[in-house]
Swiss-Prot record:
Stated name of the protein: Tumor protein p53-inducible nuclear protein 2
Single Gene Ontology MF annotation: ubiquitin binding
Pfam families referenced in this protein's UniProt entry, alphabetically: DOR
Coiled coil: none
Record flagged with keyword NAD: no
Source species, domain of life: Eukaryota
In-chain residues carrying the UniProt-annotated modification Phosphoserine: 136
Disulfide bonds: none
Compartments, as annotated in UniProt: Cytoplasm, Cytosol; Nucleus; Nucleus, PML body; Cytoplasmic vesicle, Autophagosome
Classification of source organism: Eukaryota, Metazoa, Chordata, Craniata, Vertebrata
Length: 199
């Protein structure tokens, strides 16, 4: 299978076609979504491979697989570069891939805490008491909805680890500040400061 493909690149160029020579083995080329589909003619046979062992006399040759019949070829990105300067190829991404990559539940860069909105007692809407005057007889007024309580699912373990680490850093900073305040208010420090001012 790959021998035929590599022979296209590494073999000597074919002589110019004569009227009595058979046509090219590629019968149809279609490009679909960046893929080049090449269908081989049914009558095409691969040239004999000199390294291949001859088949036993009692056995028929193996049937070609489906991959031998057609190829899906796509050029590398360096050959499909677009733009005036033929710069690097712009990769197009699927919007669903972006959702998976940028979804907050998968983010490791969690800052702050999650906000949970609780619904309080319903507040009266001044617009609700007014009749809908600008609607025609056939139109329905849009239903007004109360804001729902927003509950977040538990954060994934890496996000929790980040939050716990930040909480630990805050505790260490608070302890260091408390030690510094105690140090400045200790009796020995005050006596040293008084002696320094007197001299």
């Amino acid at each position: 299978m790959f021998q035929r493909f590599t022979s296209l690149f590494f073999s000597t160029p074919a002589p110019p076609e004569d009227s009595n020579c058979p046509g090219a083995f590629v019968s149809e080329e279609d490009e679909v979504d960046g893929w080049l589909i090449i269908d081989l003619q049914d009558s095409y046979t691969a040239p004999p491979d000199p390294r291949a062992s001859p088949a036993p006399a009692g056995r028929p040759p193996p049937a070609p697989s489906l991959m031998d019949e057609s190829w899906f070829v796509t050029p590398p990105a360096c050959f499909t570069a677009e733009g005036p300067g033929l710069g690097p190829a712009r990769l197009q991404s699927n919007p669903l891939e972006d959702l998976l990559i940028e979804h907050p539940s998968m983010s490791v860069y969690v800052t702050g805490s999650t906000i949970v909105l609780e619904s309080g007692p319903p507040s009266p809407h001044p617009e609700a008491a007014l009749p809908d005057q600008d609607l025609s007889d056939g139109e329905l007024a849009p239903a007004r909805r109360e804001p729902r309580a927003l509950h977040h699912a538990a954060a994934p373990m890496p996000a929790r680890a980040v939050l716990l680490e930040k909480a630990g850093q805050v505790r260490r900073l608070q302890r260091a500040r408390q030690r510094a305040e105690r140090h400045t208010l200790s009796a020995k420090v005050l006596q040293r400061q008084n002696r320094a001012r007197e001299s």
